[in-house]
């Protein structure tokens, strides 16, 4: 729309909207999960430090107890997962896909917020525009009422003409409160979208009376292109990818996990701390295999497969709904464009007819009903 005031409102809403803050928090959580999954492929380290007092309660030949001995254990070990079964790789893929799904959900919230702000802003401007238009028509009808009253007093009109003119004025005035209510409702919604109480709506928007206009045709492209841009489609697709990766995570438990590790150990009596003969080391593969629990692992695999099947069904439903919504929106946009062009022509024609009817009535060439009808047609065309 190239409207700086509208752009500023959208920016404020994107910063302050509570739903968007929650979506941003979900994205930060997904980032943390990705870091956690990626960190599983790095070196693991552990440190051991232990000290004990060992006492032998046997007695010597002299009848005294044996003295206690202080011992210690110090160790440092390093392990690195080889990921031969691909479990860590699939876990990372799943977390990345989950993050992309959360990001798509956040994008959907952003689009919804921007669209809601734009609609609320347009509703305020439209309500003011419609009210101003009706007030102009009321002014014309008031002039007609004044003229018919003057004609009646001069003996050239009837009380019926005056009552019909007054009815037209009052009928038009009766529509004004509806525009006020529509404007207030849109302002309250706008305040809520900006993260404020309804009464704290932006005061400068309240007086907006110029309808937002597209500066260029909407770049809709075709239906397929619009669907590819939809965040709900991306979210559903990335959800499938994440849950598919978790099938690999569950399947990997059917096979052993292998790590390579090594460590340095220093233990013995405290007085030997640091001496060469108290050091030792270890190096080799570490094997872990849950083969006794294979039925449990297979159950997890079945559950993961069922989850993906459900995701695919939901994806199909989302795509069908997106196709319906996209085609409906494109058709509505095209027909609204045609309707706007027709209403523009109708408004111009109604304006000419109203002016002609007023002139003919003034010179006694037309009756009052024709004038009131022309003015009503003008009001309807302008409001639409």
Predicted segments with their positions:
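Small/polar, glycine/serine/threonine/aspartate-rich low-complexity segments that form flexible
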Residues: 1, 11, 50-77, 200-219, ...
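Amphipathic alpha-helical coiled-coil segments
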Residues: 22-37, 109, 113-145, 149-150, ...
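Compact, aliphatic and Gly/Pro-tolerant "microcore" segments centered on a short helix or tight beta-hairpin
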Residues: 43, 48-53, 57-148
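Charged, alpha-helical scaffolding/interaction elements associated with membrane systems
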Residues: 16-17, 154, 229, 363
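Repeat-solenoid scaffold signature
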Residues: 153-182, 384
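A glycine-/polar-enriched beta->alpha junction
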Residues: 12-21, 28-44, 75-93, 104-111, ...
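Transmembrane beta-barrel architecture of outer-membrane proteins
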Residues: 6-8, 71-73, 119, 164, ...
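Short, solvent-exposed, mixed-charge loop/turn linkers that connect secondary-structure elements
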Residues: 136, 156-158, 177-227
């Amino acid at each position: 729309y190239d409207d700086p005031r509208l752009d500023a409102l959208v920016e404020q809403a994107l910063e302050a909207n509570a739903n968007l803050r929650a979506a941003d928090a979900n994205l930060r959580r997904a980032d943390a999960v990705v870091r956690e999954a990626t960190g599983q492929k790095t070196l693991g380290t552990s440190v051991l430090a232990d000290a004990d007092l060992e006492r032998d309660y046997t007695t010597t030949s002299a009848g005294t107890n044996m003295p206690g001995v202080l011992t210690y254990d110090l160790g440092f070990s390093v392990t690195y997962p080889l990921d031969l079964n691909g479990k860590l790789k699939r876990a990372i893929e799943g977390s990345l896909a989950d993050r992309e799904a959360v990001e798509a959900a956040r994008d959907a919230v952003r689009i919804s917020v921007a669209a809601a702000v734009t609609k609320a802003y347009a509703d305020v401007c439209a309500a003011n525009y419609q009210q101003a238009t009706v007030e102009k028509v009321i002014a014309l009808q008031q002039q007609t009422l004044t003229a018919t009253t003057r004609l009646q007093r001069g003996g050239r009109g009837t009380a019926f003409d005056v009552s019909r003119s007054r009815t037209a004025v009052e009928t038009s005035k009766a529509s004004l409160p509806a525009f006020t209510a529509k404007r207030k409702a849109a302002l309250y919604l706008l305040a809520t979208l900006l993260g404020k109480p309804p009464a704290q709506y932006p005061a400068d928007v309240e007086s907006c009376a110029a309808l937002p206009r597209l500066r260029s045709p909407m770049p809709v492209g075709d239906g397929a292109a619009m669907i590819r841009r939809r965040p709900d489609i991306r979210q559903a697709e990335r959800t499938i990818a994440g849950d598919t990766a978790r099938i690999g995570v569950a399947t990997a438990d059917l096979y052993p996990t292998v790590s390579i590790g090594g460590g340095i150990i220093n233990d013995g009596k405290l007085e030997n701390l640091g001496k060469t003969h108290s050091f030792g080391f270890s190096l080799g593969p570490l094997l872990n295999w849950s083969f006794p629990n294979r039925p449990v692992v297979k159950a997890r695999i079945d559950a993961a497969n069922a989850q993906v099947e459900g995701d695919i069904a939901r994806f199909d439903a989302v795509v069908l709904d997106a196709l319906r919504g996209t085609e409906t929106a494109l058709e509505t946009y095209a027909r609204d464009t045609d309707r706007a062009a027709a209403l523009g022509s109708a408004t111009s024609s109604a304006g000419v007819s109203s002016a002609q009817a007023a002139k003919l009535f003034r010179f006694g060439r037309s009756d009052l009903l024709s004038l009131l009808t022309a003015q009503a047609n003008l009001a309807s065309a302008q409001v639409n």
